[in-house]
Curated annotation (Swiss-Prot):
HAMAP family the UniProt entry points to: UxaC (MF_00675)
Protein name listed in UniProt: Uronate isomerase
GO BP: any one term: D-galacturonate catabolic process
Gene Ontology MF, one: glucuronate isomerase activity
């Protein structure tokens, strides 16, 4: 069996037949970390390292595991030296998804069919750089070639959305680039919380003195995002908590933190519960899909974090006590307050997949006719792997309705990462194909093919309609 052919990751004849239904589907990439400024300015890339390795902490993490020096990863080494160091790593990375993604990117974007190794790295490096210039490879070119219809970026609540506005006004660019409201700094444990409150007051021209004035100012920013095409919010929590309190304590806590007080864990939980519930109320009011990423234990290597900052490859799976207790109480409280928006829950630790899918199934009732109003999101980050995807789909199929799943997202900072949608589609088709091959579902290719197409694209389109 050869590697990375037309039938790559398609393990049976049923999968091959199903893949014919999805391989030409467009991409609805509802969550990523691309910079809209880069999309608007559309500069032509002139070096493969900037495009392929720059900012990619998946690759950095792998290179560190292979003994590569930091100089050749994020430091002053030349681009050729960094490329060779990555090739030296990649040729030993069997079993890691980066090995598959890289092979797919090289072949499908650049036409490089060879396996990248240390011995051919320099020749391929120069060939790729020539390809970039000859074909004028730019962000918009990569987006168009991948048939990306929608991009959901991740945006600071006080952003002017200048670049989103420019893109929306550019009739030559057909892909919708929508902002996503990401209020990490609104939570008191964030190191920039006090600075955020000051800037929030300045931009909204409101005097923020307590919890209610804080929420009022946040609503003004949510309304601004809604006016500029926003369809979703996002937040990342280390743990899902539920600890209620009254507004008097929240006001006292707000003022103490603004004066330099360091909150304890119970106070952090109370603030997180109160703020998130208020935000959910507003997200429902403005029609935002609410994305919740949870379970990441971040910035664990303090020396690297202090030198390079966040999102550089030193994060881990987290664990927590009473996850389902807290999730159920939180969701039930939102229902009681008529504040439950459409939500996507992304669980990082696969050990909790069945528990999360089972909990979400308790709260699917809605009068809007929305299929799977609460979505169990695709495996993300460390679960963005073959086994991670299968684990997530297994849990969803057994505890909910896989046919309503909104499918894949890149969650990436790279313009080359759209190959992950194809990777997911191939794994999805093998997963469904095994059901057919093993007699677990009828051999109805029309029905299963339609299901695969829905998961690959159409379910997300429908779910994100305002």
């Amino acid at each position: 069996m050869t590697f990375n052919t037309e039938t790559f990751m398609l393990k049976n004849q049923a999968a091959i037949q199903l893949y014919e239904e999805v391989k030409r589907q467009p991409i609805f990439d509802y969550h990523c970390h691309l910079d809209p400024k880069d999309i608007f300015e559309d500069r032509i890339f002139d070096n493969i390292v900037d495009l392929w390795l720059g900012g990619d902490h998946y690759k950095w993490r792998l290179m560190r595991a292979n003994g590569i020096s930091e100089a050749e990863i994020t430091g002053p080494a030349s681009n050729l030296e960094k490329f060779k160091a990555f090739a030296r790593t990649l040729e030993r990375a069997y079993g890691n998804p980066v090995y598959h993604w890289s092979a797919m990117e090289l072949k499908n974007v650049f036409g490089v069919n060879e396996i990248l190794t240390e011995s051919n790295a320099e020749e391929i490096y120069h060939r790729l750089n020539h390809f970039l210039k000859e074909h004028k490879i730019s962000p918009r070119r990569l987006i168009a070639d991948s048939k990306v219809m929608f991009i959901g970026t991740t945006d600071y609540p006080l952003d002017t959305l200048k670049w989103h506005k420019k893109l929306a006004a550019d009739e030559s660019f057909k892909t919708v680039v929508a902002p996503t409201f990401r209020p990490d700094e609104a939570f008191i444990e964030h190191r920039h919380f006090v600075d955020f409150i000051t800037k929030l007051g300045d931009i909204t021209q409101k005097e923020i003195t307590d919890f209610s004035t804080f929420i009022a100012a946040m609503e003004e920013r949510i309304a601004y995002f809604a006016q500029n095409g926003c369809r979703a919010s996002d937040i990342s929590f280390t743990e899902i908590v539920f600890e209620q309190t009254d507004e008097l304590e929240l006001n006292d806590l707000f003022n103490k933190v603004c004066e330099g007080y360091i909150p304890n864990q119970s106070e952090i939980s109370k603030w997180q519960t109160a703020v998130f519930m208020e935000l959910c109320r507003l997200y429902k009011k403005y029609g935002f899909v609410t994305q919740v990423h949870f379970g990441a234990l971040r910035n664990n290597h303090s020396t690297i974090f202090e030198k390079l900052g966040a999102d550089v490859g030193v994060d881990s799976l987290g664990d927590q006590v009473a996850l389902t207790v807290n999730m159920n109480r939180l969701l039930d409280s939102l229902v009681k307050k008529d504040s439950l928006p459409k939500m996507i829950w992304y669980n990082l630790n696969p050990a909790y997949n069945i528990a999360v899918a089972n909990t979400l199934a308790n709260f699917q009732a809605n009068e809007l006719g929305v299929r799977s109003y609460l979505q169990f999101g695709a495996g993300w980050w460390f679960a963005d792997t073959k086994l991670g995807m299968i684990s997530q789909m297994n849990a969803l199929a057994e505890q909910g309705m896989l046919a309503n799943f909104i499918g894949m997202l890149t969650d990436s900072r790279s313009f080359l990462s759209y190959q992950r949608h194809d990777y997911f589609r191939r794994i999805l088709c093998t997963y469904l194909g095994e059901w057919i091959e093993e007699g677990e579902v009828p051999e109805d290719y029309q029905a299963l093919g339609s299901m695969a197409k829905d998961i690959a694209y159409q379910n997300a389109v429908n779910y994100f309609k305002n």
